[in-house]
Amino acid sequence: MAKLRHIAMQVPDLEKAAAFYEGVFGLRRLKKVEAPIGNAISLSDGVMNLTLLHFPEGTKRGKDGPHWAGLHHFGFVVENESVTEQEIKKHGGEFFMQLPTYPGVDAEKKFKDINGVVFDVSEHGWG
């Protein structure tokens, strides 16, 4: 069975958002990534991964510009990405994109569900 282990949220200020989740919920900072496609801070409670994303002007990866905040995507850890991809398509979902490889960036495949909601599948997880 797939396990929900990753949520990504776009925020206008990475450090401010990270300080909030670290301070309020005791989440632990795993890593910070600055890449040409955008910047991220990964936090965890030991089971779930919360990745905070910020996409500066010109990166074209964020929703509605760099000041928008909200759920960006979520992810499932699966045993077999290929089998899961077949099931996604069988149930009406579709492939969305493969992230380019950059140091520190988890290059998982992204899909859209039947309503257009973006999610990742990964055999290795995040963080």
Locate each region found by the language model.
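N-terminal beta-strand motif that seeds the catalytic metal site of vicinal oxygen chelate
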Residues: M1-K16, L71-F76, S122-G127
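Core segments of cupin and vicinal oxygen chelate
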Residues: A2, Q10-L50
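Vicinal oxygen chelate
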Residues: S42, E85-G127
